């Protein structure tokens, strides 16, 4: 593990830090996930975004099943050290497991959440089943 990389990061009590994926060109927020120290190290080593799944209790590389990998162009750490922003190039233009560009596809309008972004590719086409 790279001590210089990790020492400034304030991982929570579960050993995780919030990781935000932002499109390097459009600046749109694509997704928010979690990283442990190993996922952060792997991200730096490979240049591709790796995360830690709280539900599956394991590290994973974005796109390992779908092919929608995230090439990291820049890593940024916030002033408190408890959140990371990755400026990324999104392979295939789809970051969300629902087949949308972004996981942030719902907009609050008139007292309700409305779906604002279209599905670019059906989940079943991406994963072979509903993810």
Swiss-Prot record:
Enzyme class name: hydrolase
Subcellular location: Cytoplasm
InterPro entries reported in the protein's UniProt record: PRA-CH, PRib_AMP_CycHydrolase_dom, PRib_AMP_CycHydrolase_sf
Keyword Nucleotide-binding: no
GO CC, one annotated term: cytoplasm
EC identifiers of the protein: 3.5.4.19
Protein name stated in the entry: Phosphoribosyl-AMP cyclohydrolase
Organism phylogeny: Bacteria, Pseudomonadati, Pseudomonadota, Betaproteobacteria, Neisseriales
Underlying gene: hisI
């Amino acid at each position: 593990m790279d001590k210089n990389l990790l020492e400034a990061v304030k991982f929570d009590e579960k050993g995780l830090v919030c990781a935000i994926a932002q499109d390097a060109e459009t600046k749109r927020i694509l997704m928010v996930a979690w990283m442990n120290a190993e996922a952060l190290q792997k991200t730096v080593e490979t240049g591709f975004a790796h995360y830690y799944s709280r539900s599956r209790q394991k590290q994973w590389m974005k796109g390992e099943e779908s092919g929608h990998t995230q090439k990291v162009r820049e890593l940024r750490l916030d002033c408190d050290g408890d959140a990371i922003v990755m400026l990324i190039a999104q392979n295939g233009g789809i970051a969300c497991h629902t087949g949308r560009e972004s996981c942030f596809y719902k907009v609050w309008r008139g007292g309700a959440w409305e779906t604002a972004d279209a599905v670019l590719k059906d989940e079943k086409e991406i994963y072979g089943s509903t993810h």
